[in-house]
Amino acid sequence: MRIADNKKAIFNYHIEERFEAGMVLEGWEVKSVREGKVQLTDGYVVIRGGELFIIGCQINPLGTASTHVRPDSVRTKKLLMHKDEIRRLVGKVEQKGFTLVPLNMHWKAGKVKCEIGLAKGKGEHDKRDTIKDREGKREVERAMKSRSR
């Protein structure tokens, strides 16, 4: 079940490859994720010391959060992947133009997972093409809908 999508990443980047990673979350974060209080748009993934971290992903605390814990909504969260997958990612990210971006957050077997994408930035022209394609699809859907009535 999907929790949150990063539509901006799909618009701004060509996604070359997708990977699934587990997330290390605190208790209040899991409760907020369950309520859907997640925002991935400003998030990105970095590799430090052979480990993956997601930065800029915002998980807003619930109003009923505990008083003895100070929730930090944009704290850096560790991502869990196998070492060989991380090594492969390091090799690809070192190539010019590649970056890692969070694509979506979802539940899998009761655990929160984050789908990250190996991405290459789009130019302005590519973004305009994406908008044109999207508008064309909308027009076709409208025509089909009005035709079926």
UniProtKB/Swiss-Prot annotation:
It holds the Pfam family SmpB. SUPFAM superfamilies: Small protein B (SmpB). Keywords: Cytoplasm, RNA-binding. GO terms for biological process: trans-translation. Residues 121-149 are annotated as: Disordered. Gene3D superfamilies: 2.40.280.10. CDD domains: SmpB. It is found in: Cytoplasm. It comes from the Bacteria. GO terms for cellular component: cytosol. The keyword ATP-binding does not apply. GO terms for molecular function: RNA binding. NCBIfam families: PRK05422.1, smpB. Required for rescue of stalled ribosomes mediated by trans-translation. Binds to transfer-messenger RNA (tmRNA), required for stable association of tmRNA with ribosomes. tmRNA and SmpB together mimic tRNA shape, replacing the anticodon stem-loop with SmpB. tmRNA is encoded by the ssrA gene; the 2 termini fold to resemble tRNA(Ala) and it encodes a 'tag peptide', a short internal open reading frame. During trans-translation Ala-aminoacylated tmRNA acts like a tRNA, entering the A-site of stalled ribosomes, displacing the stalled mRNA. Belongs to the SmpB family. This is SsrA-binding protein. The gene is smpB.
